[in-house]
């Protein structure tokens, strides 16, 4: 009598991986053409939004006056109306909470003009005149220094992109995968900037730093996907894709979760701006990496173009 073969019991980790792959199988069923088309449409819409409504520059990039006020029994709108009525200066006010002391206060922003120091004194004196117990601290950012910071921020983004492009191309040595990764990073930044414009988040040195961090996050996930597909150990492209997606989704969702918690507990305007930019940038990266880049790579691997490039490289 023949002995029956014993069924190998699946490990819990294998079962979890199999469940993930079933949930993400809808991505495999998408046509490569549609995977490329949908993110391109989103990118074009974001580019149009940027053309119409680019994020406003913050005080640290365009210069101006920031007056921080504590111990004032008034709302931001009431204080802004009073300052405008008293000085004739068009100001904007917002409430904040100091992360160190826990005290609540109001920040008043005034645009940069010919004499920012004089404007700061006028606003401070007007507040002290009505609110005797107010703790008023003015800060002046000269427009010249704002322009310098703006130029340095633009240079930092350009140099980061050039450095990233060189490293990616040297690593893969293929124009199509390398170009797709570079475009995905660019698209993430465009979508993040468009979101800033819609939500009214100002472009500051802090948000520029967030955009630079976004380049690193984008390249990580795209290199993971591209490496898995081009140098795959699995039997099929679909298996390699699902393996990369399950790993990449875990990486990105944990980062998104941490950023969301940071945004919830933060009382700093700077941290709030950074986290919002990164959250929307990473959401865009989900689409650009696992749909757009995957669609391009699936087409590229199946096309004769890859074979001709390999022949030229092998000569």
From Swiss-Prot:
NCBIfam families attached to this UniProt entry: PRK08578.1-4 (NF006356)
Q: Which GO terms describe its cellular component?
A: plasma membrane
Its gene name is: secF
Keywords, comma-separated and alphabetical: Cell membrane, Membrane, Protein transport, Translocation, Transmembrane, Transmembrane helix, Transport
Protein's job: Involved in protein export.
Subcellular location(s): the record lists:
Cell membrane
Kindly give the InterPro entries that the UniProt entry links to this protein: SecD/SecF_arch_bac (IPR022813), SecD_SecF_C (IPR048634), SecF_arc (IPR024921)
* Sequence intervals crossing the membrane: 35-55, 152-172, 181-201, 205-225, 242-264, 282-302
Quaternary form? Part of the protein translocation apparatus. Forms a complex with SecD.
> How does the entry describe its membrane topology?
Multi-pass membrane protein
The record's comment on protein family reads:
Belongs to the SecD/SecF family. SecF subfamily.
Organism of origin: Thermococcus gammatolerans (strain DSM 15229 / JCM 11827 / EJ3)
An example Gene Ontology biological process: protein targeting
Name the record gives this protein: Protein-export membrane protein SecF
